[in-house]
């Protein structure tokens, strides 16, 4: 400016620059470092001049260099080392090495006026000047990547310049200047003393920098470029800022009077831009920053504009303060900032003269330049820090590290501000502004098009105009998306004032170069790409965003992934900020919802590490969310750390490493002492590490060694301390032991735990690691590598937050001393620093860490029960969460919707979700009924409630986990773990539920009627249009509502919440992929919306709308069915849905399946398959395959859903897989076994009685069952595969096998109505057959031996047929027909009406609802009574006939004795006909369906395969031999477990299978009267215990009651009681964690234990044709050889001991044994190391075996 001013003042004088050399000694200051930022270098030449000098790009105010160094000073030497022609990094390194003092020799350009005669000898001066200026500017932009930027050269510079000073004009002038003969002279004045004066008086003049063609000025001809403006409208302009001059011009109101003086030599035009210098000064926000920025600029070719911007802060503290400066300082003057500071600048125009000038000074300069630029950024309103920070030319708006210092460095471009080309346009906004925008924060916002006849066009805006400001909002550094949104958000009719500047040439270059936005972001959530062009990413990845309006549409950003060494790796699409926030919020919020327990775990895996106790960990994690404070996308800039970064070491020998470093290198490293924390500190963590403590160490120029948790690391990053996090990766457990023995023999820490925790830490928090060192136990080479790594990291540029830590300071995590409060805050994660004990201990100090390790151990212990050990919060979270969580959340939530069929992973993820929440599993166990309960309004609700209570006492933890997994077959497995307790509890509770909870109320209680509806919707959606519906809408609805359930799985069991719980589980998954879900919703909105809406209504009789699709069914068992659909019942009923999909039999099958499921659940529960998240993942994946996907998505959304139909869906027939009997039982329905099937079939009828069923306890149980199924499916894709045939047999691994007749299925807990209730719930789940859809996504579909979609379609057709034809008339028969044959069809038809649409959506919800109703009613008349109102009304008629049959399933076997699940409808009816009948009358039909479902679930597992599973299209397989019924369970082999789980009733295990067999045939044989017959048949078929277990309900007499009670009974019967399974569990001294059994035929199937995640996938053809082979397996834990399990963390068995049987069985084709392995690799390795048939997948270890 001085040059300009001088030139302006005297044309006779020529401005020349001379170079003065000064040597200064800088003393490093704690907060500032040396207080300078440098740019340039051989590798980062000035983008315009090409100068390679090292330039001071910024001088921090108040820093050591203030007053000594100035911006644009060329660094000649540092400590005697020449800086000529060196690389930027070298210069930075020299400064870093200088220690506390640095002797810097600089050359400073001094501009002097010389007579015109005196030629300016130094051509360089121009170049240098330019480069100087440019450099300065560059630094701003350049720090970010001066080299590239510079190479982008004039253009980028222009870009930034244009923002800072009008780009083209300046560059033009520059170019002109260069062309001019007189070149600037370099002048350097070096002060010998600080207070010495230069003796110069500078002035500035406004001159005409550019005249636009065809403009008034051009036409007038009296004004020429280079003219000095003396007056504007009578006001003298000397020393006037550009901003003021611009203002004067703006006020001219159409008439502008100016007095100009011609400068023939155009000296001013030839003067190199000083703006850049100033800019540069600004750019040099910090000395360190400049380096980083320049690197950043290199990093992003365009970020040169902002390079210096972020060279802020030596210490985070300083950084925050300077960051402001730097931000502004970034080269491109952040116009927004500029504006705000512009004003300041304007006040100090002279500041320009001294390069050292403050940021404000820079601002003034900017002001001049700002004419153009300033115009852009002039509006202080845009001081918006972030956009403002992004310099005009700065590619990375957020890149500038320093947030505010160079506020308006951009202003430096003030020269452009007053350009003649500028125009101020005012108009009223019409429907739109009428503008199309181009460009972005890197180049400015340009008008790409103007709508003809729009106000903007009329006012003269045209293409190529740069929008500098809109309504006082600076547009110079704003990203295009923000600009568009800002214009869109302007109210119609509001006056719009746009300051624009004509820059057609720049615009042309922008368009040609396709540049616009350029800024860097760091991701803080995990995302799975939604399209082939998308980019998936994990936390902590960095991207350069180059287009925020990809394809001209809002929603997606075009970004480039930044790989190692800051190189741009790949380009693709990522969600925009808004969507990212939603996705991230879902991921982080999920855990908070009910069922969030588990979710929290997953979500807070890293955070958890800070918590000691498993339980405490879980609670604490929920209570104090560890989720990062960072936004989904954190704007970052690459800069150098101006301070010694704290060092955090993770790994098994971290404690040793810290002590060794501090001991051997005390001058470099110091351990940060922890201070006692207020009450409640972790045992091991003596306290917290205060930020103040860290700061003190940093101020001593030492690395603070921190023993903190990953959570604390995240907080430190947020506070911008950017710790160096080194992970010492152990080579093996033994290696850890060896090293610790050698390094710290006195340590008592467990090498095993340290090793495991390290694995978990790596899995969950790898994104926090800055470097990883692989340990070699043979030597101590790690120590040298550690020191080297720390030094290397310290010298590297760091991606730092562009702005101040918004929450950091406010969060107590002040960048200053306050930060200590952040760290110290007892509640803060920082507090966990010390707590690190937990975190660290997770990996390092296992033994001493009583708390943490205890946690771990506790977790492991809990793991057995809960399946989600908190372990170290980090570990546990990471294990399940990482894979599961991300997969789960992501896939479940997002993925399933994405690829309903290709979502095996999602299923896994779902698995994970199901698996991951231990609480969910628990809830599931508890909600075996609860799930049903969600689906079974009355029973479900009631059951859920009681169940909750009981389960809570018994084994809520396990049950909770189950629910999450329960949604699919996995859920079944999941349930299995808690089956015993859950079953038992459920039995007790269910009766209670039905007695003390009105089904309706319960359903209501579901608390989320909408949610329930959603869940139902989800299930139903799947049935109706599972592909899109459930993935999207329902999942969302379901997930969120269920999430809460997850948290209170028991609760959910207790209340409809169970249902919700599922939802929550899904929500967890969903949250992760919330967006995806949304997407899905978009995909399925129509149907899902429909369903969703219906579902919303669905909670109650509202189902009728659903009736269209599933209306009747749903209504009948609105929730119950929903439960079944969503839950497991849908599975059974879902089989019908599948049937609708491909065959009606699914309806039957579902019923049967449900029954079977109930029976099997006991074993399943026993198995705890559900409980085992890992196991779940497989089923999850498995189920997902085809239908599964859709269903799964829905189910994913709602676990309940997933298990219900999702899995069933996938299996198609295999729906039974989860409720093994679900589908197969359908077939047996006709025969004795079909009777069981009828149960399944009946689940379809339940839709008619949905209202009742919703209330039905049975329904609730069904819900659980369904959930289990879902989970199982999720968990084991293979399970699903076999599901078709195997599902039937699968449900009760041991029990089923033992009780071929189906009695075992029912039998497990036929003794009590509670059990029945559970059964009902299971039955309720039967509707889950929707799951088959889930299955398809995985593999299960193939195993299922029928295409779920095919099935679905067939089922749909049949359902519609059935719905219309006998939905109302013969629900029982319908079930039977659907499940078994003709009867099933009627039932099916009934269901179908609801189911037809619903079935495609996963009829299960409806079925579930019905089942639930059944369960509840059957379970308890009382419940039945509550449900009746909703259910009966819709299903009263239809359900009447079937009710008897359905209830029969419930027979005492199911209820009382796990074994004698007694699908005896008669018994069932008899048992609880009275209460239910009244309610069930309408729902009676449905209840029978439910009962059928129960039977089907129970026996159906056997019959279902035959009927529905095997021949997905067969509707009238009611005459399935009992054997077949039994066989049906095969597909449900896995299902069986879910059943068990669902019912958590040991009793169910034993009788479930036999009863099922017996009942199924009967049921299947009967159509309208089939229920009764079935009941009788079941009675007969059922073994005595089955009978005893069955509470018979007269099918005809007590249809309503029968339905409700029946359902309750069936569900109880279906689930193999956990106790039964567990009884088996403790065999031979082994602890049987889970048991699964099922009967499979040549169609194959999947036998899975949701709880454990173990599954056997039996391919088609593995079993000879015509052979129905019962297969079982037990998952044992031999504590003597297996490490403790952290079930809470989702850690199943690290090395599961799986006992398969029967021994000696040989397969024609190898069967796949899948062992879940979420986190533990030791597990994988232990399984079958070296075996070619052994495959370690993401979530499981797969072993191929050809014999047992």
Swiss-Prot record:
The keyword Membrane applies. Residues 123-136 have a biased composition (Acidic residues). It is found in: Cell membrane; Cell junction, Tight junction; Cell junction; Cell junction, Gap junction. Residues 23-110, 186-264, 421-502 form the PDZ domain. GO terms for molecular function: cadherin binding; calmodulin binding; cell adhesion molecule binding. Residues 633-876 are annotated as: Occludin (OCLN)-binding region. GO terms for biological process: actin cytoskeleton organization; actomyosin structure organization; adherens junction maintenance; ameloblast differentiation; cell-cell adhesion; cell-cell junction assembly; cell-cell junction organization; establishment of endothelial intestinal barrier. PROSITE patterns: GUANYLATE_KINASE_2, PDZ, SH3, ZU5. It is a peripheral membrane protein. The gene is TJP1. The alpha-containing isoform is found in most epithelial cell junctions. The short isoform is found both in endothelial cells and the highly specialized epithelial junctions of renal glomeruli and Sertoli cells of the seminiferous tubules. Residues 516-584 form the SH3 domain. It comes from Homo sapiens (Human). SMART domains: GuKc, PDZ, ZU5. TJP1, TJP2, and TJP3 are closely related scaffolding proteins that link tight junction (TJ) transmembrane proteins such as claudins, junctional adhesion molecules, and occludin to the actin cytoskeleton. Forms a multistranded TJP1/ZO1 condensate which elongates to form a tight junction belt, the belt is anchored at the apical cell membrane via interaction with PATJ. The tight junction acts to limit movement of substances through the paracellular space and as a boundary between the compositionally distinct apical and basolateral plasma membrane domains of epithelial and endothelial cells. Residues 102-189, 295-396, 825-1081, 1095-1587 are annotated as: Disordered. It comes from the Eukaryota. Its main location: membrane. The modification Phosphoserine is found at residues 125, 175, 178-179, 212, 241, 275, 277, 280, 284, 290, 294, 297, 300, 323, 329, 334, 337, 353, 617, 622, 810, 821, 824, 828, 837, 912, 968, 1071, 1111, 1139, 1366, 1413, 1545, 1617. This is Tight junction protein 1. The modification Phosphothreonine is found at residues 185, 267, 354, 809, 846, 848, 854, 861, 868. Keywords: Calmodulin-binding, Cell junction, Cell membrane, Cell projection, Gap junction, Membrane, Phosphoprotein, Repeat, SH3 domain, Tight junction. Residues 149-175, 299-327, 357-377, 879-892, 998-1014, 1110-1125, 1269-1286, 1336-1347, 1403-1420, 1538-1547 have a biased composition (Basic and acidic residues). Phosphorylated at tyrosine redidues in response to epidermal growth factor (EGF). This response is dependent on an intact actin microfilament system. Dephosphorylated by PTPRJ. The lineage of its organism: Eukaryota, Metazoa, Chordata, Craniata, Vertebrata.
């Amino acid at each position: 400016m001085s040059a300009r001013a001088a030139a302006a003042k005297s044309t006779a004088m020529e401005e020349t620059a001379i170079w003065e050399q000064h040597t200064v000694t800088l003393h490093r200051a704690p907060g500032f470092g040396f207080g300078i930022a440098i740019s340039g270098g051989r590798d980062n030449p000035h983008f315009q001049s090409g100068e390679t000098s090292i330039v001071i790009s910024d001088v921090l105010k108040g820093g050591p260099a203030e007053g000594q160094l100035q911006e644009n000073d060329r660094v000649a030497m540092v400590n005697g080392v020449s800086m000529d022609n060196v690389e930027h990094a070298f210069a930075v390194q020299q400064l870093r090495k200088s220690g506390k003092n640095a002797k810097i020799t600089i050359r400073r350009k001094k501009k002097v006026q010389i007579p015109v005669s005196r030629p300016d000898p130094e051509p360089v001066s121009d170049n240098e000047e330019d480069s100087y200026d440019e450099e300065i500017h560059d630094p701003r932009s350049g720090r970010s990547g001066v080299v590239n930027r510079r190479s982008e050269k004039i253009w980028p510079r222009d870009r930034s310049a244009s923002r800072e000073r009008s780009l083209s004009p300046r560059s033009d002038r520059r170019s002109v200047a260069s062309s001019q003969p007189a070149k600037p002279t370099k002048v350097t004045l070096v002060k010998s003393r600080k207070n010495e004066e230069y003796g110069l008086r500078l002035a500035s003049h406004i001159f005409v920098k550019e005249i636009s063609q065809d403009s008034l000025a051009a036409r007038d001809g009296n004004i020429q470029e280079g003219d000095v403006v003396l007056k504007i409208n009578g006001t003298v302009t000397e020393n006037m800022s550009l901003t003021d001059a611009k203002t004067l011009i703006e006020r001219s109101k159409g008439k502008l009077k100016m007095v100009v003086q011609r400068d023939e030599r155009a000296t001013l035009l030839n003067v190199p831009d000083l703006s850049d210098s100033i800019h540069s000064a600004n750019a040099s926000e910090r000395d360190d920053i400049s380096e980083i920025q320049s690197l950043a600029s290199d990093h992003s070719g365009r970020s040169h504009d902002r390079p210096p911007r972020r060279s802020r802060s030596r210490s985070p503290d300083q950084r925050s303060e300077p960051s402001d400066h730097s931000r502004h300082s970034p080269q491109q003057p952040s116009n927004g900032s500029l504006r705000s500071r512009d004003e300041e600048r304007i006040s100090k125009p002279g500041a320009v003269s001294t390069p050292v000038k403050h940021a404000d000074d820079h601002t003034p300069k900017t002001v001049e330049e700002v004419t153009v630029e300033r115009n852009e950024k002039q509006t202080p309103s845009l001081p918006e820090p972030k956009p403002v920070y992004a310099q005009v030319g700065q590619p990375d708006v957020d890149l500038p590290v320093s947030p505010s210092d160079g506020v308006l460095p951009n202003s430096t471009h003030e020269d452009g501000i007053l350009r003649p080309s500028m125009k101020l346009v005012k108009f009223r906004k019409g429907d739109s502004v009428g503008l199309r925008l181009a460009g972005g924060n890197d180049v400015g916002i340009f008008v790409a098009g103007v709508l003809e006849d729009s106000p903007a066009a009329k006012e003269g805006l045209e293409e190529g105009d740069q929008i500098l400001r809109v309504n006082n909002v600076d547009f110079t550094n704003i990203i295009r998306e923000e600009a568009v949104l800002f214009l869109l958000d302007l109210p119609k009719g509001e006056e719009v004032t746009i300051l624009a500047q004509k820059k057609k040439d720049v615009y042309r270059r922008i368009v040609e170069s396709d540049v616009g936005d350029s800024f860097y972001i760091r991701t803080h959530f995990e995302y799975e790409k939604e399209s082939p062009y998308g980019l998936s990413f994990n936390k902590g990845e960095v991207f350069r965003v180059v287009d925020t309006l990809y394809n001209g549409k809002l929603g997606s950003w075009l970004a480039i992934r930044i790989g190692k060494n800051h190189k741009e790796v790949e380009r693709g699409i990522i969600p925009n900020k808004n969507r990212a926030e939603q996705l991230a919020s879902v991921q982080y919020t999920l855990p908070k919802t009910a069922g969030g327990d588990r979710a929290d775990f997953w979500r807070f895996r890293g955070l958890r590490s800070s918590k000691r106790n498993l339980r405490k960990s879980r609670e604490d994690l929920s209570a104090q969310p560890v989720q990062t404070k960072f936004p989904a996308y954190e704007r970052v800039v690459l800069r150098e750390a101006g301070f010694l970064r704290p060092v955090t070491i993770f790994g098994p020998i971290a404690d040793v490493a810290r002590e060794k470093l501090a001991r051997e290198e005390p001058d470099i490293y110091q351990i940060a002492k922890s201070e006692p924390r207020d009450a409640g500190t972790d045992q091991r963590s003596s306290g917290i590490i205060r930020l103040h403590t860290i700061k003190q160490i940093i101020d001593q120029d030492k690395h603070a060694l921190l023993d903190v948790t990953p959570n604390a690391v995240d907080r430190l990053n947020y506070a911008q301390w950017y710790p160096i996090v080194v992970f010492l990766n152990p080579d093996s457990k033994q290696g850890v032991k060896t090293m610790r023995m050698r390094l710290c023999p006195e340590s008592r820490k467990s090498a095993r735990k340290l090793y495991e925790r390290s694995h978990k830490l790596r899995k969950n928090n790898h994104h926090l690691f800055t470097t990883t060192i692989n340990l070699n136990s043979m030597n101590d080479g790690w120590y040298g590598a550690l020191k080297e790594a720390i030094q290397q990291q310290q010298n590297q540029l760091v991606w730092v937050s562009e702005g101040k830590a918004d929450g950091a300071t406010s969060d107590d995590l002040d960048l200053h001393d306050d930060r200590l409060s952040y760290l110290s805050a007892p509640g803060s994660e920082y507090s966990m620093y010390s707590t690190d004990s937990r975190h660290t201990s997770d990996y390092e100090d296992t033994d001493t860490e009583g708390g943490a390790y205890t946690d771990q151990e506790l977790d492991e212990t809990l793991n057995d029960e809960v399946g989600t050990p908190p372990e170290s919060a980090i570990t546990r979270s990471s294990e399940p969460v990482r894979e599961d969580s991300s997969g789960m959340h992501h896939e479940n939530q997002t993925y399933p919707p994405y690829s309903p069929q290709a979502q095996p992973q999602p299923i896994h993820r779902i698995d994970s979700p199901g698996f991951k929440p231990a609480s969910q599993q628990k809830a599931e166990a508890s909600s075996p009924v609860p799930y049903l309960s969600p689906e079974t309004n009355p029973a479900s609700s009631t059951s859920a409630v009681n169940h909750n209570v009981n389960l809570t006492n018994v084994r809520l933890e396990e049950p909770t986990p189950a629910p999450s997994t329960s949604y699919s077959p996995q859920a079944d497995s999941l349930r299995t773990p808690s089956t015993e307790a859950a079953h038992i509890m459920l039995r007790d509770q269910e009766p209670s539920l039905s007695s003390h909870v009105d089904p309706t109320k319960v359903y209501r209680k579901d608390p989320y009627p909408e949610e329930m509806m959603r869940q139902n919707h989800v299930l139903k959606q799947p049935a109706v249009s599972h592909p899109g519906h459930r993935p999207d809408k329902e999942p969302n609805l379901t997930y969120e509502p269920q999430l809460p359930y997850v948290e209170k799985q028991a609760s959910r069991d207790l209340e409809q919440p169970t249902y919700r719980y599922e939802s929550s589980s899904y929500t967890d998954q969903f949250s992760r992929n919330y967006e995806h879900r949304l997407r899905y919703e978009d995909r399925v909105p129509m149907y899902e919306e429909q369903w969703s809406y219906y579902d919303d209504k669905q909670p109650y009789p509202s189902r009728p709308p659903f009736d269209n699709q599933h209306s009747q069914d749903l209504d009948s068992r609105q929730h119950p069915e929903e439960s079944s659909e969503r839950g497991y019942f849908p599975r059974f009923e879902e089989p019908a849905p599948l049937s609708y999909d491909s065959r009606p039999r699914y309806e039957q099958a579902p019923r049967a399946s449900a029954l079977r499921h109930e029976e099997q659940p006991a074993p399943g529960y026993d198995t705890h398959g559900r409980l085992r998240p890992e196991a779940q993942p497989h089923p999850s994946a498995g189920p997902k395959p085809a239908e599964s996907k859709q269903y799964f998505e829905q189910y994913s959304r709602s676990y309940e859903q997933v298990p219900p139909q999702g899995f069933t869906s996938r299996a198609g027939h295999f729906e039974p897989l989860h409720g093994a009997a679900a589908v197969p039982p359908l077939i047996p329905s006709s025969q004795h076994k079909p009777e069981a099937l009828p149960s399944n079939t009946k689940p379809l009828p339940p839709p008619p009685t949905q209202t009742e069923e919703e209330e039905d306890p049975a329904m609730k149980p069904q819900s659980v069952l369904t959930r289990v199924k879902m989970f199982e499916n999720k968990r084991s894709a293979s399970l699903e595969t076999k599901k078709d045939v195997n599902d039937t047999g699968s449900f009760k691994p041991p029990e089923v096998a033992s009780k071929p007749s189906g009695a075992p299925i029912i039998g497990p807990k036929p003794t009590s109505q509670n059990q029945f209730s559970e059964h009902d719930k299971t039955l309720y789940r039967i509707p889950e057959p929707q799951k088959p859809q889930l299955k398809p996504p995985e593999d299960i579909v193939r195993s299922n031996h029928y295409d779920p979609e095919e099935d679905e379609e067939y089922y749909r057709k049949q359902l519609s047929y059935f719905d219309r034809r006998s939905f109302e008339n013969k629900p029982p028969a319908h079930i039977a027909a659907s499940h078994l044959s003709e009867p099933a069809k009627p039932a099916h038809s009934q269901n179908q009406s609801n189911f037809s649409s619903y079935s495609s959506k996963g009829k299960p919800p409806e079925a579930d609802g019905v089942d639930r109703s059944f369960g509840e009613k059957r379970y308890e008349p009382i419940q039945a009574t509550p449900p009746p109102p909703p259910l009966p009304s819709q299903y009263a008629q239809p359900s009447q006939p079937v009710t008897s049959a359905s209830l029969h399933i419930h027979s005492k076997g199911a209820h009382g004795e796990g074994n004698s699940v007694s699908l005896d409808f008669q018994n069932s009816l008899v048992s609880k006909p009275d209460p239910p009948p009244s309610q069930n009358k309408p729902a009676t039909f449905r209840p029978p369906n439910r009962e059928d479902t129960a039977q089907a679930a129970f026996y159906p597992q056997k019959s279902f395969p035959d009927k529905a599973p095997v021949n997905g299209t067969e509707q009238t397989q009611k005459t399935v031999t009992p054997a077949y019924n039994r066989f049906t369970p095969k597909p449900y082999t896995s299902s069986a477990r879910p059943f068990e789980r669902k019912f958590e009733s040991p009793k169910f295990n034993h009788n479930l299978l036999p009863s099922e067999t017996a009942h199924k045939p009967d049921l299947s044989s009967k159509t309208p009267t089939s229920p009764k017959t079935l009941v009788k048949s079941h009675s007969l078929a059922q073994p005595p215990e089955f009978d005893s277990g069955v509470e018979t309900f007269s099918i005809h007499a007590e249809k309503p009651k029968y339905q409700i009670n029946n359902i309750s009974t069936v569900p109880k019967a279906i689930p193999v009681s956990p106790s039964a399974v567990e009884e088996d569990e403790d065999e031979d001294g082994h602890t049987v964690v889970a048991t699964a059994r099922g009967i499979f035929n040549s169609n194959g199937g999947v036998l899975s234990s949701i709880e454990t995640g173990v599954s056997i996938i039996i391919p088609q053809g593995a079993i000879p044709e015509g052979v129905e082979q019962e297969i079982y397996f037990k998952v044992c834990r031999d504590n003597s050889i297996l490490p403790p399990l952290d079930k809470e963390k989702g850690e199943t068995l690290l090395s599961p001991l799986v006992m398969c049987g029967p021994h000696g069985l040989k397969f024609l084709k190898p069967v796949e044994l899948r062992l879940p392995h979420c986190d533990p690799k030791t597990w994988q390795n232990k399984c079958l190391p070296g075996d070619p048939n052994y495959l370690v997948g993401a979530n499981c270890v797969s072993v191929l075996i050809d014999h047992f």
